[in-house]
Amino acid sequence: MPKRAIIPAGSGVPLAPFVPGTLADGVLYVSGTLPFDKDNNVVHVGDAAAQTRHVLEIIKSVIETAGGSMDDVTMNSIFITDWANYGAVNQVYAEYFPGEKPARFCIQCGLVKPDALIEIASIAHLGK
């Protein structure tokens, strides 16, 4: 099965050996996305809603670079550092998925940088 790396224009260099997305057989796998700028600095420190919006904009960019849209998302995996931010995360999340919602899960855990409050990984079905 051939696969293709999806790297939006202006993407920074990841902290580890991975690409923002991989397209294989019509399915786009979007790597865990953190609220980082292109230099891997955490943005919107202390603001879960703004970090969520930043992360979802990056994910949207990856999906659009692959030729899809947020409507193609079938699964989101959400990692948050504090359940107190769950409401703010959901409020922003709902703006990006106003129609039929994709499957998802959300867990509380530590993240790679202490100021990062959220990480999201996505799967989108773009067809063949």
UniProtKB/Swiss-Prot annotation:
EC numbers on record: 3.5.-.-
Catalytic activity: (Z)-3-aminoacrylate + H2O + H(+) = 3-oxopropanoate + NH4(+)
Top-level division of the source organism's lineage: Bacteria
UniProt KW Oxidoreductase keyword: no
This protein's record includes keyword Hydrolase: yes
GO cellular component, one term: cytosol
Molecular function GO terms recorded: deaminase activity
One of the GO biological process terms: uracil catabolic process
Major enzyme class: hydrolase
S-S bonds: none
Keywords: Hydrolase
Family assignment from sequence similarity: Belongs to the RutC family.
PANTHER family tied to this protein: 2-IMINOBUTANOATE/2-IMINOPROPANOATE DEAMINASE RIDA, PROTEIN HMF1-RELATED
Job description of the protein: Involved in pyrimidine catabolism. Catalyzes the deamination of 3-aminoacrylate to malonic semialdehyde, a reaction that can also occur spontaneously. RutC may facilitate the reaction and modulate the metabolic fitness, rather than catalyzing essential functions.
Name the UniProt record assigns to this protein: 3-aminoacrylate deaminase RutC
